[in-house]
């Protein structure tokens, strides 16, 4: 989701997430504010390591009382590893932490990123009649599937249906 094509070189580059609503104008239709936080410099998910997991956990803890849920945009290379690590590091969580991404850059006409992000946000704020989070755990949402963070593996590097939770789906 976080990559756009450089029109001069054709290379994929990260973009400023404060510009996210420019690429997904439908985000304006939500009746609540959407705040963003971006690591500087942005990180390629293939370089993800435990120190970054600790940083994500710290950000969630520092902002826990401000939000109903959290959505983490993540590259697909190591998304399943990050989701699993966060699920154990955030033990006792009572709010959704939804990881999502895309197989195609956000500015591509048929990108899967828009649907993945929009649905992830909806899941992150979903509440039941008792005003409790519907999904109070770390999950991955990808291509119409919501999967437990610590039970998901990447099965395909090219297809939209890139992840699976074979043994313990939601």
What spans do the regions from the language model cover?
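Active-site histidine-anchored catalytic micro-motif
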Residues: 1-170
């Amino acid at each position: 989701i976080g990559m756009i094509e450089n029109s001069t070189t054709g290379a994929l580059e990260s973009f400023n997430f404060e510009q996210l609503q420019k690429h997904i104008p439908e985000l304006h239709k939500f009746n609540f504010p959407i705040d963003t936080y971006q690591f500087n410099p942005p990180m390629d998910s293939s370089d993800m390591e435990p120190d970054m997991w600790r940083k994500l956990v710290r950000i969630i803890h520092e902002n826990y009382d401000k939000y109903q849920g959290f959505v983490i945009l993540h590259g697909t290379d190591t998304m399943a590893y990050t989701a699993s690590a966060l699920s154990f590091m955030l033990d006792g969580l009572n709010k959704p932490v939804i990881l999502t991404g895309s197989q195609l850059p956000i500015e591509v006409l048929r990108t899967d990123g828009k649907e993945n992000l929009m649905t992830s946000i909806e899941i992150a704020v979903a509440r039941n009649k008792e005003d409790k989070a519907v999904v109070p755990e770390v999950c991955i949402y990808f291509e119409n599937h919501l999967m437990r963070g610590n039970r998901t593996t990447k099965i395909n590097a090219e297809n939209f249906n890139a992840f699976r939770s074979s043994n313990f789906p939601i």
